[in-house]
């Protein structure tokens, strides 16, 4: 709960700064790299979270580890360190992405099929979904042989289940 609140507040603030500096995508990419490292590297997480490690040492470490980042991204990361908020990186990135998607009219769509669709089928599906939603579609394909055939499309909270498994279950229930 706190991570989401902190994440939202900081994401809104840094998104505004990034937008004013025309660095929205660059900052998202940088934050995402830091988040993945935070999730996957226990030593990095421990260093960032450890209360006895001074902020200046953390900033120095950030600048060294992420030296390939542009100065703008490094400044934002150091700001998060200064405010003791780098440990909330997951919430910040999640909220930042929500803002980015909303402002750029992008929607995540999860499509589950029994077999992998061809590139042509994926392109056609994206085209139809973009027409239906009026937004750019970020399509994630999942494979689940249990649905037998057909597909299940999830757009936000809406689920369109056109799987043979659901149809068989409906017939069986009678």
Curated annotation (Swiss-Prot):
Topology with respect to the bilayer: Peripheral membrane protein
One protein family per Pfam: OSCP
This protein's UniProt keywords: ATP synthesis, Cell inner membrane, Cell membrane, CF(1), Hydrogen ion transport, Ion transport, Membrane, Sodium, Sodium transport, Transport
Chief site of localization: membrane
Matches recorded under InterPro entries: ATP_synth_OSCP/delta_N_sf, ATPase_OSCP/d_CS, ATPase_OSCP/dsu
One Gene Ontology cellular component: plasma membrane
Cellular compartment(s): Cell inner membrane
Gene Ontology MF annotations: proton-transporting ATP synthase activity, rotational mechanism
UniProt GO BP: sodium ion transport
Subunit comment: F-type ATPases have 2 components, F(1) - the catalytic core - and F(0) - the membrane proton channel. F(1) has five subunits: alpha(3), beta(3), gamma(1), delta(1), epsilon(1). F(0) has three main subunits: a(1), b(2) and c(10-14). The alpha and beta chains form an alternating ring which encloses part of the gamma chain. F(1) is attached to F(0) by a central stalk formed by the gamma and epsilon chains, while a peripheral stalk is formed by the delta and b chains.
Family membership noted in the UniProt record: Belongs to the ATPase delta chain family.
HAMAP family the UniProt entry points to: ATP_synth_delta_bact
Other observations noted: The ATPase of I.tartaricus is of special interest because it uses sodium ions instead of protons as the physiological coupling ion.
Functional description taken from the UniProt entry: F(1)F(0) ATP synthase produces ATP from ADP in the presence of a proton or sodium gradient. F-type ATPases consist of two structural domains, F(1) containing the extramembraneous catalytic core and F(0) containing the membrane proton channel, linked together by a central stalk and a peripheral stalk. During catalysis, ATP synthesis in the catalytic domain of F(1) is coupled via a rotary mechanism of the central stalk subunits to proton translocation. This protein is part of the stalk that links CF(0) to CF(1). It either transmits conformational changes from CF(0) to CF(1) or is implicated in proton conduction.
Protein name (Swiss-Prot/TrEMBL): ATP synthase subunit delta, sodium ion specific
Species in which this protein is naturally found: Ilyobacter tartaricus
